[in-house]
Amino acid sequence: MALERTFSMIKPDATRRNLTGAITKMLEDAGLRVIASRRVWMSRREAEGFYAVHKDRPFFGELVEFMSSAPTIVQVLEGENAIARNREVMGATNPANAAEGTIRKVHALSIGENSVHGSDAPETAAQEIKYWFSDTEIVG
């Protein structure tokens, strides 16, 4: 099976609580390798652009506010079936429904402050990676 790349983000609720290392370790322990990583404090404009797919949803304003409230860690992960593997280790969006041992079950505070984001398909992974990284910043 070929290696796959995906986008991952450690959200403000987790960076505020100094969970970057713990979450990255969980990703690496699941067989994912960090091949690009950067700490960013999103502007409102960057958050609106990144989450543009949700612009007509009722939670959009709150999402933008939250994502621009503190630093995030944006990452490119690589591994076998990286998209599915990342989503599995993240757990369900609602931490109450997340499986034991997943990032969201262990670290999330709520459905809104759920610690991590991960791409859901190859197309979104490519778009999300390109939003934050140039090709020269990704070192496999």
From Swiss-Prot:
Keyword Zinc in record: no
Give TM segment ranges: none
Methyltransferase as UniProt keyword: no
Using the UniProt record, name the top-level EC class of this enzyme in a single word: transferase
Q: Name one GO cellular component term.
A: cytoplasm
Q: State the family it belongs to.
A: Belongs to the NDK family.
Q: What is this protein called?
A: Nucleoside diphosphate kinase
Provenance organism: Mesorhizobium japonicum (strain LMG 29417 / CECT 9101 / MAFF 303099) (Mesorhizobium loti (strain MAFF 303099))
Upper classification of the source organism reads: Bacteria, Pseudomonadati, Pseudomonadota, Alphaproteobacteria, Hyphomicrobiales
